[in-house]
Amino acid sequence: MPEDDVRNKFLDAGDSDDDAGHGSDSEDDFQKGGRNAKRRRVSDDEDSEADDFTDAEEEHDQDDAESKDAPAKDGQETTDGKEKKDGKKEKEKKSVLASDLPGMTKPLTKKNLIVTEEAIKKSGVVYISRVPPFMTPAKLRSLLEPYGKLNRIFLAPEDPVARRKRIRSGGNKKKMFTEGWIEFVKKKDAKKACELLNARPIGGKKGSYYRDDIWNLLYLKGFKWHNLTEQIAAENAERSSRMRAEISKTTKENKEFVRNVERAKVLQGIQAKKASKGSKAGGEGAAQVTESTIPSAAATTTTTTNDDKRRTFKQIPLAKKRKLDETQPEQVQRVLSKIF
């Protein structure tokens, strides 16, 4: 008895969650006692333990659900954090590339580096007499930048008539440039580039488009960029003056043509009125007789008379003044002879 009481007090009341899963062992232990009262109490205790176990399972399920939600949220937060980190890394890479390669992102929108008189004196201009086919200013800049700092590039485009003819004959529609001028910030770089590259192939990779083309470079001594702009401005002014002269000439010709057309219309109206008046005055019979007798001669004479009779405007001659030496009448002479 005392052993059973001790076992029931300490073992039944102090069942932990770990012992709840071992129901078979506890049932074997209770069967050893062999008493109904003990079994009833054990069954009650088992019901309470089962309720506790179900409550524990529900709490465990809730904890699992919360734990599942928590990692999902943590995963979202981690992905957002990773994306932010990746964006920061890309920005840092772009900034590093921009710092390593200044001016390579927008090579054609650079500011003018040569402004002061000292910079103008130090600058040098190189003339390229033949631009390789379909080479753009950006490509030319990328090829010449390793040999010195460049400022401005000007390439003369192909003649539009020649371009149209080339495209019509099945050629490429890309832009072509015939010649160009490159401005170096330092004239010594321009001289070295001309000495090194002139009459030599462009080179590069084996499959590059301009690998076998040859450089045609000439350093222009004493030539500055403003001389080029002045030359271009002079050519543009000459072209505009020529165009103005041609336009004035064509306007004069057009005005003269319009004036002649209006005069011809007036003369035709006058001739039509004269013909209508003559037909009314002459009568129909005489006109029929003349037309039946000599129709061809009448037609020729009318055409000739109409053509010959042109309206001419002449000034009326002025009245002549009396001469002093004219002979005076006899009465006047008689009176004058009596007086004098």
Swiss-Prot record:
Which superkingdom is the protein from? Eukaryota
Question: Per the record, GO CC terms?
Answer: nucleolus
Mostly located where? Answer: nucleus
Which Cys residues form disulphide pairs? none
Query: From which residue to which does the signal peptide run?
Result: none
Coiled coil regions, renumbered to chain:
none
All copies of domain RRM, residue ranges: 124-214
* Keyword annotations from UniProtKB, A to Z: Nucleus, Ribosome biogenesis, RNA-binding, rRNA processing
Q: Does the keyword rRNA processing apply?
A: yes
Task: Please state what the protein is called.
Answer: Pre-rRNA-processing protein esf-2
User: What residue spans carry the Basic and acidic residues bias annotation?
Assistant: 1-12, 19-32, 65-95
The job of this chain, per UniProt, is described as: Involved in the small subunit (SSU) processome assembly and function, and in the 18S rRNA synthesis. Required for the early cleavages at sites A0, A1 and A2.
> One Pfam family, short name please?
RRM_1
Q: Where is the composition biased (Acidic residues)?
A: 44-64
Q: Which GO terms describe its molecular function?
A: RNA binding
**What are the start and end residues of every segment in region (Disordered)?**
1-103, 272-329
Hey, which family's this protein in? Belongs to the ESF2/ABP1 family.
Biological process, per Gene Ontology: endonucleolytic cleavage in 5'-ETS of tricistronic rRNA transcript (SSU-rRNA, 5.8S rRNA, LSU-rRNA); endonucleolytic cleavage in ITS1 to separate SSU-rRNA from 5.8S rRNA and LSU-rRNA from tricistronic rRNA transcript (SSU-rRNA, 5.8S rRNA, LSU-rRNA); endonucleolytic cleavage to generate mature 5'-end of SSU-rRNA from (SSU-rRNA, 5.8S rRNA, LSU-rRNA); small-subunit processome assembly
